[in-house]
Amino acid sequence: MDPKRLLIFRAVARAGSISGAARDLGWTQPAVSQHLRALERSVGCALLLRGAGGVELTEPGRVLLVRADALAVQLHMAEEELADLSALRRGRVRLAAYPSAAATLVPRAIAGLRSRHPDIDVELTEAEPPEALDLLNAGDVDLAVVFSYGDDPVDTPGLRWTPLAGEPVALVVGADHAAGRRKRLTLRDLADEPWIVGCARCRAHTLLLCADAGFEPRVRHISDDYVVVQNLVAVGLGVTLLPRSALEAYRHPDVTVREHASFGTRTYGIVHREGAEQVPATAALVRELSA
């Protein structure tokens, strides 16, 4: 049953005549009659009795009019809901972000979005990049903030990756560590130190840098939590490399931070499925994250 023809039938029933419905719809009378005949053929019975004074509903016509009224109500509700979504009067965005972004970039973006569009809800899930991409591919989130090192580009088949900015990676040692007082410092100088590493991508970056410096680090501790990592460093249990955003999110008072171009940079950005940028609420959050 064609919904369009069902709504035309409803217009005729409400107007009481084919000519009246044609005027209401802005159609020609023959076009309305043609759709009515096609609808009656599809249901296999007469829906209207035509007469000089207009039309009269048959019993099947009265039954069908109830359904046609319900369809019209549902379509009107859909139009209103879509209008609200388009105007950002309502909406929801499910966002995944790695820990340091979730502590710095994301709160600012959500606050900015809320100030402009208070009826948009953002649901945040903390996830490292591989897990965030899995969530995207599974349809469990709409948007992800992820990072990539130059030696480990974001692999996003079927997804759109938009880099936002780069951030330096810093060496972090205890405040009383001799390396923190050196004017010139290389990773090679720390070849004999115990190392603390983080997530898989960060760990791979550290191992690659150390290999380029001519040694394999003695990894003693593994943690994705930059607070845990800095506390371990602060009490002399190892040294580590951390991106600037992790140090902006939390800076232990008993660590020394040294930045150098040789420690590399990390690029962060936004990933989403193709077409998601056309969803109003998602597009609004992307703008805030990119600001």
Where in the sequence are the language-model features?
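Short helix-boundary/capping micro-motifs
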Residues: 11-26
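A short LG(V/I)-centered, amphipathic sequence patch enriched
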Residues: 40-57
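Alpha-helical linker/hinge and terminal dimerization helices associated
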Residues: 42-43, 64-86, 147
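Central regulatory/effector-binding core of bacterial HTH transcription factors
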Residues: 90-153
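Hydrophobic hinge/microswitch elements
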Residues: 128-141, 147, 201-256
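Secondary-structure junction motif
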Residues: 147, 179, 193-213, 278-286
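Beta-alpha-beta core module
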Residues: 154-162, 167, 227-275
